[in-house]
């Protein structure tokens, strides 16, 4: 597909990398010459120096021939103007990044009077991810698939847990329809077989329906989150407070900027807003941070978030949620040492790639959706079986799948099946697959040759 991007910031850079890896023709429009040269030198893309909301620049980029136009600058209005122009000039699909709460209300998004194909708000997506984690505090991460029929959660196994040394084959006997679809052990990702056992310090990725996953989550026996401290009153905090407004969670916010603290006090009069440096040890202790069920560290500085979370973990906070925008930092730190890491940039890129893959595969294959897990090392894919093929009408145990592939769920006529080796695929099924293999786009890519 021919894809035009406007804006070479963090999201734009990461998106260029993903699009090039999937063999798309990418053209980047960027006003900063140094940024443009850096990205063009890193990836096999075309670059144009200029304003993406300028008609002449869009004409130079042949926007009328592009399949998908994506506006990702730091300015919402520029993104919207650029996308409206691109659509008028002939772009088939338009995606915009919009971050301002004024443009993220339900009316604006649902009515979509400007006709965008997709509106992406990284901070709102991150807030929703944090809310999911607060709902399931024992989990490191929570994902939902197949219209939220299927949940996938990540847990750390401790030596004191009853899960330690449990064979994978025993999980269904003990917990019902749950499947361990991946294990991270000693920094390696494994798609487990039934005879493997779970070990101390394993990070396990478990999938099941909502009810079974709630029961599995509660097996860990930690208390629900009834109190939450938020450090840093930015956009993510704003959206998170809106999501949690009816939750009865006792919430406090610490913000260093007096004007922002005052704004939050006006917007959320029932909350306790503290003006101060929430990354300072004395203020954290003064505000009794150690007694909160969960702390979300959401300042604009990744390093401060990481160091603050390390301190909070040391003083006994059970659930630390840490915002990290620079994924390069995740390669330096020991991520398993952190309770839950939220990366808005990655969430936004995954959302956009999900959309793009859906458009590509509507034309060329039966892949409907994809999600990344474990910092991109695991892909969860959803296929639609449109017609009888060599994978249908035979037990799953007889399918010769490639190494690193696991069938996690089957959606059939609105019902979710968490399969055993005796289940069979049927025409019309939607198939949820977990894999370590990159660039899987067709269902036959799952089969060993």
Regions found by a protein language model. Give the residues of each.
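Cytosolic regulatory regions of ion transport systems
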Residues: 1-449
């Amino acid at each position: 597909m021919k894809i035009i991007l406007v804006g070479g910031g963090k999201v734009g850079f990461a998106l260029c990398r993903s699009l090039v890896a999937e063999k798309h023709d990418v053209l980047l429009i960027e006003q900063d010459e140094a940024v443009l040269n850096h990205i063009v030198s890193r990836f096999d893309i075309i670059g144009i120096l200029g304003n993406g909301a300028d008609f002449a620049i869009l004409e130079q980029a042949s926007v009328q021939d592009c399949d998908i136009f994506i506006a990702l600058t730091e300015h919402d209005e520029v993104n919207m103007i650029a996308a409206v122009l691109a659509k008028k000039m002939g772009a088939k699909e338009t995606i915009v990044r919009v971050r301002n709460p004024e443009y993220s209300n339900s009316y604006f998004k649902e009515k979509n009077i400007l006709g965008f194909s997709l509106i992406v708000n990284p901070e709102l997506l991150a807030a929703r991810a944090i809310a999911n984690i607060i709902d399931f505090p024992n989990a490191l991460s929570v994902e939902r698939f197949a219209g939220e029929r299927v949940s996938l959660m990540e847990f750390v196994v401790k030596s004191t847990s009853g899960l330690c040394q449990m064979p994978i084959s025993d999980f269904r006997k003990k917990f019902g329809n749950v499947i361990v679809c991946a294990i991270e052990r000693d920094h390696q990702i494994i798609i487990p077989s039934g005879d493997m056992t779970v070990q101390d310090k394993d990070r396990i990725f478990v999938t099941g329906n909502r009810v079974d996953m709630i029961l599995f989550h509660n097996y860990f026996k930690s208390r629900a989150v009834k109190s939450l401290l938020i450090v840093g009153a930015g956009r993510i905090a704003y959206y998170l407070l809106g999501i949690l407004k009816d939750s009865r969670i006792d919430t406090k916010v610490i913000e260093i900027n007096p004007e922002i603290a005052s704004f939050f006090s006006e917007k959320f009069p029932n909350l306790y807003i503290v003006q101060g440096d929430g990354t300072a040890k004395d203020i954290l202790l003064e505000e009794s941070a150690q007694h909160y069920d969960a702390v979300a560290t959401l300042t604009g500085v990744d390093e401060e978030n990481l160091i603050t979370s390390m301190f909070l973990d040391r003083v006994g906070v059970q659930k630390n949620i840490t915002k990290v925008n620079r994924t390069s930092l995740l390669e330096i730190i020991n991520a398993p040492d952190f309770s839950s890491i939220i990366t808005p940039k990655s969430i936004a890129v995954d959302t956009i790639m999900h959309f793009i893959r859906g458009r590509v595969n509507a034309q060329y294959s039966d892949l409907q959706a994809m999600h990344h897990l474990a910092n991109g090392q695991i892909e969860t894919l959803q296929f639609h079986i449109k017609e009888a093929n060599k994978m249908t009408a035979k037990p799953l145990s007889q399918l010769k799948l490639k190494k690193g592939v696991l069938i996690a769920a089957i959606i059939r006529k609105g019902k979710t099946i968490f399969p055993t080796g005796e289940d069979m695929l049927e025409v019309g099924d939607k198939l949820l697959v977990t894999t370590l293999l990159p660039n899987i786009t067709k269902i036959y890519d799952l089969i060993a040759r």
